[in-house]
């Protein structure tokens, strides 16, 4: 319950990191939840504790070693100078977990996506306008062949190597999505490698959305968040969010399309409107703002959700409003 409560406040730190800390009365270390950084320690008979990334950093007589070990993923190592002992990880966390009724807070306040009942039928695909919509959102033959078809036919994620050596979007003679202008050329390396087994054991796509409270105050209100099993929603799940009126939670759908005839000038005008409508939604007590480009048509074109969400985010931060509402995107752009 303690961990679930704190998950409502802040996402886990993946690292890789090994952090050492002290306040003068105690000294300790903690490892990231994946355990991707080595931290080994010796406790000697002459009351010394030695911790380093590798064994053998300081010469030690093996006969003088009382105990030795390594810091485990997500675990604390603490030496209390006043008590003159090493405090176990379970003892530290049990003390904090027993200070408040975290389980009761979670039960009273947290909302799961499954709790929200959808009314009516979710919007589906219009076969008559499907091709036009795909073109509007930059779908290509390669997108279908290498990304979407493996998902449909083989029920697996498409495989590929990291690093992108395709032609730069700025040199293309075809319209490209704004995301294509930001690519990572090199391959990211982890140490050790992250495999599917480690992913299943440690990693999670679960996330929390909705208004947030003061990080420095431990109150029941922190648990008032909406828990999502994953950040990508099905049409039925999004439809449930759109019509949500549950335990004081409501959502406001904000259209991010504009008339095609307005041209480039319409982009800035629309971004300003989206910011105003989001701020108004906060004043009216909405918990979620859904930025939607579903209204795209021959006469209406969408602002990129990357621009829309980024602009709204920074506008709300600038006006000290960001933590008062959650942002959800309904878009045809999300695929990579």
Regions picked out by a protein language model, each given a short descriptive name:
Residues 20-22, 50-52, 78, 255:
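Residues in well-ordered beta-strands of folded domains
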Residues 30-76, 86-113:
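Extended active-site and interfacial segments that coordinate phosphate-rich ligands
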Residues 49, 75, 180, 307-310:
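Residues on a specific face of well-ordered alpha-helices
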Residues 3-6, 14-16, 34-37, 60-65, ...:
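Short alpha-helical segments and helix-capping/turn motifs at coil-helix boundaries
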Residues 7-10, 30-32, 85-279, 283:
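Extended, highly charged accessory segments
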Residues 35, 76-77, 293, 312:
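Conserved structural-core and active-site-/substrate-pathway-adjacent residues in large, well-folded domains
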Residues 1-18, 24-29, 41, 57, ...:
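Glycine-rich phosphate/ribose-binding loops and adjacent secondary-structure elements
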């Amino acid at each position: 319950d303690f961990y679930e409560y704190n998950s409502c406040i802040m996402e886990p730190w993946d690292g890789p990191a090994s952090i050492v800390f002290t306040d003068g009365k105690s000294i300790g270390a903690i490892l990231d939840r994946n355990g991707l950084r080595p931290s080994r320690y010796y406790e000697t008979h002459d009351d010394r504790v030695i911790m380093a990334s590798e064994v053998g950093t300081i010469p030690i007589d093996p006969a003088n070693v009382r105990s030795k070990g390594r810091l485990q993923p997500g675990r604390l190592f603490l030496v209390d100078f006043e008590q003159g002992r090493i405090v176990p990880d379970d003892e530290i966390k049990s003390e904090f977990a027993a200070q408040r009724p975290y389980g009761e807070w979670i039960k009273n306040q947290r909302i799961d996506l499954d709790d929200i009942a959808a009314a009516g039928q979710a919007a589906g695909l219009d076969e008559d306008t499907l091709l036009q919509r795909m073109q509007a959102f930059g779908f290509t033959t390669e997108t279908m062949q290498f990304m979407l078809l493996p998902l449909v036919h083989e029920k697996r994620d498409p495989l590929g190597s990291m690093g992108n050596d395709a032609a730069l979007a700025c040199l293309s003679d075809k319209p490209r999505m704004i995301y294509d202008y930001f690519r990572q050329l090199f391959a990211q390396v982890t140490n050790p490698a992250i495999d599917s087994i480690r992913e299943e054991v440690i990693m999670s796509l679960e996330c929390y959305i909705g208004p947030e409270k003061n990080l420095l105050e431990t109150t029941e209100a922190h648990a008032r968040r909406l828990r999502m099993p994953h950040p990508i929603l099905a049409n039925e799940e999004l439809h449930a969010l759109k019509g949500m009126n549950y335990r004081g939670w409501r959502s406001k759908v904000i259209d991010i399309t504009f008339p095609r005839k307005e041209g480039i000038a319409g982009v800035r005008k629309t971004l300003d409107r989206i910011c105003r409508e989001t701020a108004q939604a906060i004043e009216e007590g909405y918990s979620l703002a859904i930025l939607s480009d579903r209204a795209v048509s021959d006469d209406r074109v969408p602002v990129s959700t990357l621009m829309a969400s980024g602009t709204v985010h920074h506008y709300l931060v600038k006006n000290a409003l960001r933590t008062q509402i959650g942002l959800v995107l309904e878009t045809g752009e999300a695929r990579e």
